[in-house]
């Protein structure tokens, strides 16, 4: 099954997550099909903390990809950020 999930990157104590489309049997940080965004929980000031390519995410969902619970929460958060702008 294909899933959209977070792959951890960054340094020790400084996490950075890539939002990736991957086969569910692969390791969390292993080989992935496509990168569709990122999440930086430690963003400060004017740094961008969340970016999602919604067109690519919608494409993969239409192909049957499942969202992880965390990615689902972040997509909702991203939608709320985009409405006022």
UniProtKB/Swiss-Prot annotation:
PROSITE patterns: RIBOSOMAL_S16 (PS00732). GO terms for biological process: translation. It comes from the Bacteria. InterPro entries: Ribosomal_bS16, Ribosomal_bS16_CS, Ribosomal_bS16_dom_sf. GO terms for cellular component: cytoplasm; small ribosomal subunit. Coiled coil: none annotated. Keywords: Ribonucleoprotein, Ribosomal protein. GO terms for molecular function: structural constituent of ribosome. NCBIfam families: S16. Belongs to the bacterial ribosomal protein bS16 family. This is Small ribosomal subunit protein bS16. It comes from Nitrosomonas eutropha (strain DSM 101675 / C91 / Nm57). The gene is rpsP.
């Amino acid at each position: 099954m294909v899933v959209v999930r977070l792959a951890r990157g960054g340094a020790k104590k400084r996490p950075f997550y890539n939002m990736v489309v991957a086969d569910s049997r692969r390791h969390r940080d292993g080989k992935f099909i496509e990168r569709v965004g990122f999440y930086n929980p430690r963003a400060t000031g004017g740094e961008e903390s969340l970016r999602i390519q919604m067109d690519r995410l919608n494409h993969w969902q239409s192909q049957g990809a499942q969202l992880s619970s965390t990615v689902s929460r972040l997509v909702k958060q991203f939608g709320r950020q985009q409405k006022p702008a």
